[in-house]
Amino acid sequence: MATTHAQGHQPVLGNDTLREHYDYVGKLAGRLRDPPEGGTLITTILFLVTCSFIVLENLMVLIAIWKNNKFHNRMYFFIGNLALCDLLAGIAYKVNILMSGRKTFSLSPTVWFLREGSMFVALGASTCSLLAIAIERHLTMIKMRPYDANKKHRVFLLIGMCWLIAFSLGALPILGWNCLENFPDCSTILPLYSKKYIAFLISIFTAILVTIVILYARIYCLVKSSSRRVANHNSERSMALLRTVVIVVSVFIACWSPLFILFLIDVACRAKECSILFKSQWFIMLAVLNSAMNPVIYTLASKEMRRAFFRLVCGCLVKGKGTQASPMQPALDPSRSKSSSSNNSSHSPKVKEDLPRVATSSCIIDKNRSFQNGVLCK
């Protein structure tokens, strides 16, 4: 009967394989609604706006690190890589939302695996990046050496390994580890994914997070028990970064733990038995919000990053105001030339030297304007 139903609605449903799997786990009716699964237009717009905000703020982090030479060191390379992961997570989830609902059934299984796999690649890269940061901090604390800017090979090696592991984990379903034509093994949250694959991913990510916690606990013990002060190698900056990263890891665990628990429930439950699995979009959104919180943590916890952010924003504002104020400059110049025309032509060099002072004094006189004649008043 299900087959007859599918044949009668082939132009609407599109792919039989996807329809059969969604029907088996009980998500077919929800996906035929736009927005899917009981969502409203407001929540869909909210999710899309959140994803756009995630992309924008993480792009600002990358630009700030790229433009500021102080951030061209190991730790900020890792933070930049984490920002790149968060940026890609925002893009991947936005694409996922736009391709959901009825559009799901117009996808081939390969495109479906790419759509869902991109989220797992971003998650894997984020988790591995946090592990790489913990490894780097641990090695630095053990050696107690100043940072050598010329030795960056370890940084890029760790970052490369992060992405290699992430792509490998995300590609497993499309390479064959899935539940196509094996319905009892299908996940309810991701109907083409094998429950064994999801259990494997959760175990991998949990092991990574436990390793991260152990490494930071060891770093803390090294700092407390060491007779040498960390001030011997730029400690203020180092400890500020350490606090920032610990906060990032804590927020990561808080945001992703509910989704991990939901996946474990998915592995344990049979199809259509656990109603909470049909509300997975809220758990996924909480996990994606982690990508929006990381740049906020960088800004609040690091003075250097906060200054870089403000410079970046103020620089854009100054450029925008400068282009608007530039047409007024020719109108002001003749007044100066008239006042200077009463003097002898022999005094013209002196007039040129005094011009910057006039611009500065006009800044001081008019305190109500922060930008005047192309000059930024402080």
Swiss-Prot record:
Annotated glycan sites: N15
Positions where Phosphoserine occurs in the chain: S326
Keywords: Cell membrane, G-protein coupled receptor, Glycoprotein, Membrane, Phosphoprotein, Receptor, Transducer, Transmembrane, Transmembrane helix
Topology term for the membrane: Multi-pass membrane protein
Cytoplasmic topological domain: 66-74, 137-154, 218-244, 303-378
Extracellular topological segments: 1-44, 96-115, 176-196, 266-281
Residue ranges, annotated region (Disordered): 323-354
Pfam family, one: 7tm_1
Cellular localization per UniProt: Cell membrane
SMART domains: 7TM_GPCR_Srsx (SM01381)
Domain of life: Eukaryota
Gene Ontology biological-process entries: adenylate cyclase-inhibiting G protein-coupled receptor signaling pathway; inflammatory response; negative regulation of establishment of endothelial barrier; Notch signaling pathway; regulation of interleukin-1 beta production
Record bears the keyword Transmembrane helix: yes
Tissue specificity note: Most abundant in heart, lung, kidney and spleen; low but detectable in brain, thymus, muscle and testis; and nearly undetectable in liver, stomach, and intestine. Expressed in embryonic lung from embryonic day 14-18. Also abundantly detected in embryonic nasal cartilage, sphenoid bone, vena cava, Meckel's cartilage/incisor teeth, genital tubercle and bladder.
Keyword field contains Glycoprotein: yes
InterPro entries noted in UniProt: EDG3_rcpt, GPCR_Rhodpsn, GPCR_Rhodpsn_7TM, S1P_rcpt
GO cellular component: plasma membrane; presynapse
SUPFAM superfamilies assigned to the protein according to its UniProt record, in alphabetical order: Family A G protein-coupled receptor-like
Molecular function in Gene Ontology: G protein-coupled receptor activity; integrin binding; sphingosine-1-phosphate receptor activity
Comp. bias (Low complexity): 337-348
Annotated TM spans: 45-65, 75-95, 116-136, 155-175, 197-217, 245-265, 282-302
Family per similarity comment: Belongs to the G-protein coupled receptor 1 family.
Job of this protein: Receptor for the lysosphingolipid sphingosine 1-phosphate (S1P). S1P is a bioactive lysophospholipid that elicits diverse physiological effect on most types of cells and tissues.
Protein name per UniProt: Sphingosine 1-phosphate receptor 3
Gene this protein is translated from: S1pr3
